Structure formats: structure tokens, C-alpha cells
Amino acid sequence: MAIFLIDLPPSDMERRLGDALTVYVDAMRYPRGTETLRAPMWLEHIRRRGWQAVAAVEVTAAEQAEAADTTALPSAAELSNAPMLGVAYGYPGAPGQWWQQQVVLGLQRSGFPRLAIARLMTSYFELTELHILPRAQGRGLGEALARRLLAGRDEDNVLLSTPETNGEDNRAWRLYRRLGFTDIIRGYHFAGDPRAFAILGRTLPL
């Protein structure tokens, strides 16, 4: 088997939404049925201006094929239908988005100056989701997907939110630190969610 990174245009994400949500639920260890609850929000995100997604897929490879034998490479159709190991997507932040409103509120409560908030929030890409199936973790796929997704973005910054964890001791936190993300807000509680989150960010390009 071989792993390939692919871009997911909106039509492919809509067609493979069930597969992408399965990756999400398994990676986050959420109960079955969460897919149905999250699907409407993911579909709404797909329709946002500048939305972009990438995936890691697994295909059968002819290991003995000559390196120059391009016939051994999977076709675009094979790649677009191959089993999904990971998925990531995001879109530019904009006024009126719930996440932006929540983060701006958190920045204000944390005492950030108005101009600093404006500089940060005027031009950023929200890394909304990044998930790898548990069986495929530890292979560098998370970093590869993040780099592919963020390559060529023209925003000034990239921001994300991730659940707080003791000592930042999980794969997600290690990935974000390795990619150069720094603290924007720590211990933040989004409206309606009892968990504490960290808002992390860094400048673009990576």
C-alpha cells in the first residue's frame, strides 16, 4: 500500500463527507452518531469563500514498478475514491463567523489592544479541522497535510483552536509546536462548550 496526498475540491468533499467524518470521529474518539450531528456544519463550511481541503489516501501500489513507469501511478479517479486516512480543511476568517466572534471576545477579555486584535484578525486562515485515523498516526501525515493545505495561502496568519491537555502531551500539540504555532489565548471556553481550549497561531507562510 502507498499513501498519497490529494486536494479535495468542494464536490469531492461533499461526495466523500461520510468518509471524512468517519476519520474525524475515529481520530477524536467520539461516539458513533457524531457524524450525523456534524455533517450540516461541515457542509456549511464547504460553501464559505476560500474554503480549501486536503486528504491523505491509501492505494495499492506496484512496489516493483520501475520508477519511470508512470503507468504504475494511480489515476485521478483511483485517488479520489481511495480509502481516506486523514483530512484537513479551513477557510479565511471573516466578520460574522461564530469562531471569529468568539476569538475576538477572548482577545478583548485578555486585554489585547484594539489595534493588535485588528492586525491579527483582519487577515488569517482558520485551520478548522485536521484529523488522522488512529492507525495511521505517527507517520508524519498530520504535518504533511497541514503544509499542503497552507502552502500558497495569501493570508498573513493561520489560527486554530485545540483542546487543552495536561502538559501539551499529545500528537496534536506536538505537531502544532513543531510547525511553529504559539499561544494566542490559553484556557478559553467557547460558548456552549465546557472544555478549555487554546487558541494558537503563527504567521504565514510556514
Curated annotation (Swiss-Prot):
Residues 44-205 form the N-acetyltransferase domain. InterPro entries: Acyl_CoA_acyltransferase, GCN5-like_dom, GNAT_dom. Keywords: Acyltransferase, Antibiotic resistance, Transferase. One of its GO terms (molecular function) is acyltransferase activity, transferring groups other than amino-acyl groups. The active site is at Y176 (proton donor). The keyword Cell membrane does not apply. It holds the Pfam family FR47. Changing E129A: Unable to inactivate INH. It catalyses: L-lysyl-[protein] + acetyl-CoA = N(6)-acetyl-L-lysyl-[protein] + CoA + H(+); propanoyl-CoA + L-lysyl-[protein] = N(6)-propanoyl-L-lysyl-[protein] + CoA + H(+); succinyl-CoA + L-lysyl-[protein] = N(6)-succinyl-L-lysyl-[protein] + CoA + H(+). Its EC number is 2.3.1.-. GO terms for biological process: response to antibiotic. Signal peptide: none annotated. Disruption phenotype: Inactivation of the gene does not lead to general growth defects, and the deletion mutant grows to levels comparable to wild-type strain on all carbon sources including stearic acid. Mutations in this gene restore the growth delay in a icl1 deletion mutant. Acetyltransferase involved in the post-translational regulation of the central metabolic enzyme isocitrate dehydrogenase 1 (ICDH-1) through lysine acetylation. Can also use propionyl-CoA and succinyl-CoA as donors. Cannot act on the isocitrate dehydrogenase 2 (ICDH-2). Might play a role in regulating the TCA cycle and methylcitrate cycle when M.tuberculosis utilizes fatty acid as carbon source. In addition, it can acetylate the amino group of isoniazid (INH), one of the first-line drugs used for the treatment of tuberculosis, thereby canceling out the drug toxicity. Acts by catalyzing the transfer of an acetyl group from acetyl-CoA to INH. Following acetylation, INH is broken down into isonicotinic acid and acetylhydrazine. M.smegmatis and M.tuberculosis H37Ra strains overexpressing Rv2170 are resistant to INH. Has little or no acetyltransferase activity with other antibiotics such as streptomycin, neomycin, kanamycin, amikacin, apramycin and gentamicin. Belongs to the acetyltransferase family. This is GCN5-like protein acetyltransferase Rv2170. The lineage of its organism: Bacteria, Bacillati, Actinomycetota, Actinomycetes, Mycobacteriales.
